[in-house]
Amino acid sequence: MSVDPMTYEAQFFGFTPQTCMLRIYIAFQDYLFEVMQAVEQVILKKLDGIPDCDISPVQIRKCTEKFLCFMKGHFDNLFSKMEQLFLQLILRIPSNILLPEDKCKETPYSEEDFQHLQKEIEQLQEKYKTELCTKQALLAELEEQKIVQAKLKQTLTFFDELHNVGRDHGTSDFRESLVSLVQNSRKLQNIRDNVEKESKRLKIS
């Protein structure tokens, strides 16, 4: 059997060519043994039909084994030649052929190409960092918008409650109610200012 590892062929076929040839050899050898056993059985049956035959089954077995050794020797010689033919011409990948997964090695990169590729990688990394920062900023802004939206919702709820209170007290227009509230607030503020002034005047006198 060949001692060449043929690793590239094994990568392509999924098995080593030597393993393939070994299985073929074992299959042929098993078939040869089966044929010789069948021939031996036929000879023994023929001898049973011959009266006063001096040939014993032991002699037949010895002759069968000798013939088997003779056939096996010739078979080994023929198979050795067949193996060389298969491994050199059939199960071998030519040196100028590349497998699909090795096509990238057909045109190797130069130092300039490598530097260009390295620069592209750095640019992509910077772009990724920028996009990541932008994403984080957008998420932060989204959180702020959620807070503002919640506060706006609270304000609208408050105005709705004021509107309901005004309606319960006979004020159907919320704007009128708000204007009235502001006016009353100013009146109260004026009264408070007058009270404070009068209080100061009394203290001075």
Swiss-Prot record:
Pfam families: Mis12 (PF05859). The keyword Cell cycle applies. InterPro entries: Centromere_Mis12. One of its GO terms (biological process) is chromosome segregation. Component of the MIS12 complex composed of MIS12, DSN1, NSL1 and PMF1. Also interacts with KNL1, CBX3, CBX5, NDC80 and ZWINT. Part of the MIS12 complex which is required for normal chromosome alignment and segregation and for kinetochore formation during mitosis. Essential for proper kinetochore microtubule attachments. This is Protein MIS12 homolog. It comes from Homo sapiens. The gene is MIS12.
